[in-house]
Amino acid sequence: MSIHVVSQGETIADIAAEYGVSPNRLSFDNQLSEQDHLVAGQALLVLQPDVIHETARGETIPSIAARYGVHPLQIVRNNPFLTSQPFLRQGQYLVILYRGQSDRPLTADGYAYPFINKRLLGETLPYLGYLSIFSYGFTESGELIPIDDEPLLEAARVYGTKSVFVLTPFSEAGTFNSNLVTVAAQNMEVQENLIDNIQRTVQSKGYSEVDVDFEYIRAEDRLAHVEFVRRLTQRMNAIGITVSVALAPKVSADQPGLLYEGVDYRLLGEAANSVLLMTYEWGYTYNHSGCR
């Protein structure tokens, strides 16, 4: 992998020729079109092939992967145009290995709304171990608010990506609601109904994990919320489903504020199978469009 800093007057074709790569791939890796004008000082990622395979008639991605002793997904990751191409073409050149490419294992998780751009989803899934589908809300009686998750679940299955059922205290208006947290934590009848509904849904749809993303937990619900997570984890583990908890980024146990006072790192870590430490330096639907 190289980083090329653009000089005045350089084009994508010039840079591609310098490194011996295709202009199409250089453009794809940097999310550019070949017609884009480069700016002096702009940094471009350049991936240089080390092992290249020319496809023959009748070959498939699995057969080529077996020949080189690599996973089929490595072929797809190294040639991302394959996500939108159903069949290999005779005479195509595929990158099997890039120069300096690491084989160190890495597990990545990505959140996605049901309305995600399908091309973007297809380009991203080969790199993900988990796809967190955002999100299922619920009512004050413990009924789930359904989402159109089937297209994402099917796409995840194609790439062997595990799907994560994200549970949020979202009202039908689509916003976080502290009252829903209280009801789920304190009302045992509602809690039991909610857990039953989660179990039915994850089993019928083929989810691998449940992620509890509860925000704005009141201080008085702190321990009851932990017990809810503990009960949910016990039920899910019994059917082979793991449970994770998304945690707000606290810097001290007594940090004031509605985002933090109801979150007990130690107890929630003990109650769930894993935790996800969130950051708020991102763009999202109701905030700025990027990091700030």
At which residue positions do the language-model features occur?
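Short, structured interface segments
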Residues: 30-48, 86-99
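Active-site groove signature of glycoside hydrolases
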Residues: 132, 193-224, 273-288
